[in-house]
A protein has these predicted regions:
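Anaerobic metallocofactor- and corrinoid-dependent redox/one-carbon enzyme cores
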Residues: 2-472
């Protein structure tokens, strides 16, 4: 046996430290490095906590709570019911409130990119005459800063949301809760991508004065649009509905058009809106975010549950919220997004991971559904095989599949749903997120897209926090 082993080429599988496989590669030995980490990433306090949860007398209650959370996600039926200005509909919004993406953060601790979006919003609202005055106002303490997620909202990239901005209004028909998000400015040099010059302000003014009222009045005629059904259709047409929205945008504007042409606006204004929608496939991106938010909020606040209901980033920290731990954020450092850069930019130009758009992955689409959108690898990098494998791998850290939203390429498997902090902690597999990359400095905009994962520290804190809360 030993003679046979050494008389043929070796094909080695290495588990653990990569230095061993690296050394074999230098010797021209075929080697496969197994992507594996120990439970709790080797932190014995986390390993003990995971064991305590698994062996807890509360095990039956945990299982029942998690089943309820999964069912609430699956049974949620979000529909678009309207558009209106944030001051009219968003809980807690005031003329001097600025909502932002991610977990809570103060002006002093915000990254430069988010500060740029905030100052742009203050100029747009007429609270400052220019960016310098806006910076002084933001630092004065007169402005209230708060996470979108704590106001039933989500916000793409910087997520900056102010009183005059028009919002999607999405109702969960099953459970009655409502979620909001602002409208797409389309792509590249825009406020959510932390650009803030006069062209950005002019576009926001037009959205407030023309597009917003037109879509508001159109929805009064239409009544409601079934977003869960539309999402399922978009995934079957090649979108993953986070960074690829070709089909979703077509379906959404198709549904809105009858209301638009009956709403009494001039042909010229209608033309402007249709041209704006046609300028970028991202028009439906925020719509899916609000849809996912409506579903995930329905699963939040279930005692004993270990299901993740929020993943969000503010450019400094990545934050999680867990169903059974309402009112708490578990944070770790925001990561650098890895992926192709636009011409003229390099990785060191990029800001850290930012935005509430990871609510899509929390629900089970976006990075979790990349097998529906193999063409997305041209934007975010990687291979088609890797995109497909992401969808398979995410099933290992979730409690089930959503039969309402399926992946044709994987035998119409439902998208992986209900991320479980204990499964992440035990397996070492982190949720995959595909996302845009904003420049680290204000005023530039989007410079690429790629793949990112939460820091394990978020899950570590959540696991330990759960044990502390429930005395395990």
């Amino acid at each position: 046996m030993s003679q046979s082993l050494f008389s043929q080429p070796l094909n080695v599988i290495n588990v653990g430290i990569a230095m061993f496989s690296d050394d074999l590669k230098k010797q021209h030995v075929e080697v496969t490095q197994l992507d594996w980490t120990p439970p709790g990433q080797g932190n014995m306090q986390v390993v003990q906590a995971l064991d305590n949860i698994a062996d807890s007398p509360l095990a039956d209650k945990i299982a029942a709570a998690n089943q309820q959370a999964l069912e609430r996600i699956i049974q949620s039926h979000p529909v678009l019911i309207g558009f209106d200005q944030a001051i009219n509909v968003v809980p807690g919004m005031t003329p001097k409130t600025i909502l932002h993406a991610g977990p809570p953060i103060t002006w002093e601790k915000m990254c430069g990119a988010m500060k740029g979006a905030v100052t742009g919003a203050l100029v747009f609202e007429g609270l400052a005459k220019d960016l310098d005055e806006a910076t002084e106002l933001a630092a004065s303490g007169e402005i209230t800063f708060s996470p979108c997620h704590e106001h039933d909202c989500v916000g793409s990239m910087a997520g900056v949301t102010s009183a005059s901005m028009f919002m999607h209004i999405v109702k969960n028909k099953t459970y009655g809760n409502i979620a909001y998000t602002n409208m797409s400015e389309q792509m590249a040099k825009i406020l959510r991508m932390v650009a803030n010059d006069q062209s950005v302000i002019d576009r926001l003014n037009w959205m407030r004065d023309v597009q917003g009222p037109m879509l508001r009045d159109a929805m009064k005629i239409i009544g409601e649009i079934d977003l869960r059904l539309m999402l399922a259709q978009a995934l079957h047409m090649g979108d993953e509905c986070h960074n690829r929205n070709n089909a979703g945008t077509t379906l959404l504007i198709q549904a809105l058009t009858p209301g638009i042409i009956q709403a009494g606006y001039s042909v010229e204004q209608q033309r402007e809106v249709f041209e704006f929608v046609a300028s970028s496939d991202y028009f439906s991106g925020p719509t899916w975010m609000a849809m996912c938010k409506a579903a995930m909020d329905a699963a939040h606040g279930i005692e004993y549950s270990t299901v993740v209901t929020t993943m969000a980033r503010n450019g400094v920290e990545f934050g999680l919220r867990v169903s059974g731990l309402p009112g708490q954020w578990f944070t770790g450092p925001a990561q650098q997004v890895i992926g192709p850069m636009f011409a003229g930019y390099k990785p060191e130009d990029s800001g850290l991971d930012i935005g509430d758009s990871a609510i899509t992955e929390t629900y089970g689409i976006g990075g979790f559904a990349m097998a529906t959108a193999p063409a997305i690898v041209a934007l975010v990098g990687g291979t088609v095989e890797e995109a497909i494998d992401f969808s398979r791998q995410m099933r290992e850290i979730t409690l089930g599949e959503n039969p309402n939203v399926t992946i044709p390429l994987l035998g119409f498997m439902g998208v992986p749903s209900a991320i479980d902090i204990t499964r992440v902690g035990s397996s070492g597999i982190l949720p995959v997120i595909n996302t845009a990359i904003a420049h680290k400095d204000a005023g530039v905009g989007m410079i690429g897209a790629g793949i990112v994962h939460p820091p394990f520290a978020c899950f570590e804190k959540a696991i330990l926090g759960w044990c502390e809360r429930y005395g395990v």
